[in-house]
Amino acid sequence: MKRISFKVEDELARNLDKYSMQNHLTRSEAIRQILREKLSIMQIPTDKGKVVSGIIINDEIYECKYCHTRYLSHTGIVYHLEREHNIKKPFSPHIIKIVGDKNE
């Protein structure tokens, strides 16, 4: 498993119990909350009512041209196109790339 970052992990380890007690959270809820604050974990609604959540890494969101499902990674959209729409070796005409605005 890749390490997130030393700074976030150290802060998480040091402050977890204190944070969970102050905010009346369980340990797992406290971990999620700290990571959400530190890593910009987003939930992105799609036109079909599905919600995609994940860590925004480079401000890019990939949307399927056919069903408008959104993914936070290029790999995710490629797998989606192969599985759902039976498109072998998907390339850019099948993908709408949204760059920049996290509040999209």
UniProtKB/Swiss-Prot annotation:
It holds the Pfam family RHH_1. It comes from the Viruses. One of its GO terms (molecular function) is zinc ion binding. A zinc finger (C2H2-type) spans 62-85. The keyword Ribonucleoprotein does not apply. The keyword Zinc-finger applies. SUPFAM superfamilies: Ribbon-helix-helix. InterPro entries: Arc_rbn_hlx_hlx (IPR013321), CopG (IPR002145), Ribbon_hlx_hlx (IPR010985), Znf_C2H2_type (IPR013087). GO terms for biological process: regulation of DNA-templated transcription. Disulfide bonds: none annotated. Keywords: Metal-binding, Zinc, Zinc-finger. This is Putative zinc finger protein ORF104b. It comes from Acidianus filamentous virus 2 (isolate Italy/Pozzuoli).
